[in-house]
Structures are given as structure tokens and as C-alpha cells.
């Protein structure tokens, strides 16, 4: 089980990313637009640098929904490999069966 503080910190980051995403994307578009004057583009870069770091998408860590485990994460199920295996073996994931050949 992951530390509760780590899980909560990640939730706060997700919320902040959702709030900051439109403004951040607009500033990035201005900074990348080669048709604009360099001064305007540079100002957009400075404003982007002033924004909170936790508003950046790359700061989010994928974690298991049940345990909070940060590693061995399956995106499709939003679970870690350990939790996925436990739930699959007890038949709690619809359509998932143990393979045999």
C-alpha cells in the first residue's frame, strides 16, 4: 500500500493539471507559432515558466486505483499487476480468464 500522502499529492496534481491545461496549451501554442514576433513568443515562454509546476501533465504519476502502487501499472485497467492478478484470479474482472494452451 502506498503512502496516503503520495496518493493525495497525485490527486491534487491531477486536479491542477485539469484546471491549468487550457491556459498552458494556449501559451504553448503562442510560443511555438513561428509567424509571431520573437518578443511575443518569449513573453509566452516567460508566462509559462511562471505557472505552477504541478500544473504540468508530466508531473502526474499513474497509480493503481485500489492500492496506490506507482509501478507495474496497466493503463487499460488502471490497476497494478499485483491487484490485477488478484482480481482476475477471483473472477472479479469481467471477461478475463487465465490463459491455457
Swiss-Prot record:
Protein name: Small ribosomal subunit protein uS14
GO molecular function: rRNA binding; structural constituent of ribosome
PANTHER family in UniProt: 30S RIBOSOMAL PROTEIN S14, SMALL RIBOSOMAL SUBUNIT PROTEIN US14M
Presence of keyword Calcium: no
Quaternary organization: Part of the 30S ribosomal subunit. Contacts proteins S3 and S10.
Keyword RNA-binding: yes
Any one GO cellular component localisation term in the record: cytoplasm
Pfam families: Ribosomal_S14
Highest taxon above the source species: Bacteria
Region Disordered, annotated ranges: 1-23
Family: Belongs to the universal ribosomal protein uS14 family.
Keywords: Ribonucleoprotein, Ribosomal protein, RNA-binding, rRNA-binding
Database matches in SUPFAM superfamilies: Glucocorticoid receptor-like (DNA-binding domain)
Record function comment: Binds 16S rRNA, required for the assembly of 30S particles and may also be responsible for determining the conformation of the 16S rRNA at the A site.
BP terms from Gene Ontology: translation
InterPro entries on file: Ribosomal_uS14, Ribosomal_uS14_bac/plastid, Ribosomal_uS14_CS
Amino acid at each position: 500500500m502506498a503512502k496516503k500522502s503520495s496518493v493525495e499529492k497525485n490527486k491534487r496534481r491531477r486536479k491542477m493539471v485539469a484546471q491549468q491545461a487550457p491556459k498552458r496549451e494556449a501559451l504553448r501554442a503562442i510560443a511555438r507559432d513561428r509567424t509571431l514576433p520573437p518578443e511575443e513568443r518569449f513573453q509566452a515562454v516567460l508566462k509559462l515558466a511562471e505557472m505552477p509546476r504541478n500544473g504540468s501533465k508530466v508531473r502526474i504519476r499513474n497509480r493503481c486505483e485500489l492500492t496506490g502502487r506507482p509501478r507495474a501499472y496497466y493503463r487499460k485497467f488502471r490497476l497494478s499487476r499485483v491487484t490485477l492478478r488478484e482480481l482476475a484470479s477471483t473472477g472479479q474482472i469481467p471477461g478475463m480468464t487465465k490463459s491455457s494452451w
